């Protein structure tokens, strides 16, 4: 399975937070899964850390590498798709994740039920 982690899912995984459900844990830990972390997620975390609004690992990039997650860059196509999405969700980072999941044929692991309103395949976190 090709999985894209929503920001909170990445942070829950790294913290071994019990908020992360069993289905999501199984998908992430499955050796047959390719697990992607978007540049948008890293950007969101770094912005919120700098503003003092979020506690996250100070070595986030190292943690992504240690977990063998694959980085997913943002492209012009992703940006255009994110901007053209219906207004179900106004968070620009979440809209980017939806666009990336659509364009790259990824399953989005998220705890946000609004994400599925875009028609992208999701797994509840």
Residue ranges and their predicted role:
Residues 1-37, 50-62, 104, 113-117:
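Short, well-structured N-terminal submotif of metal-dependent ribonuclease cores
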Residues 12-13, 48-49, 85-86, 100:
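A generic structural signal for short
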Residues 37-38, 74:
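Short glycine/serine/threonine-enriched helix-capping/active-site loop
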Residues 45:
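Phosphate/NTP-binding elements of NTP-utilizing enzymes
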Residues 48, 65-68:
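Helix-loop "lid/cap" segments that line or gate small-molecule binding pockets
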Residues 57-61, 69-114, 120-125:
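Active-site neighborhoods of divalent-metal-dependent phosphate/nucleic-acid chemistry enzymes
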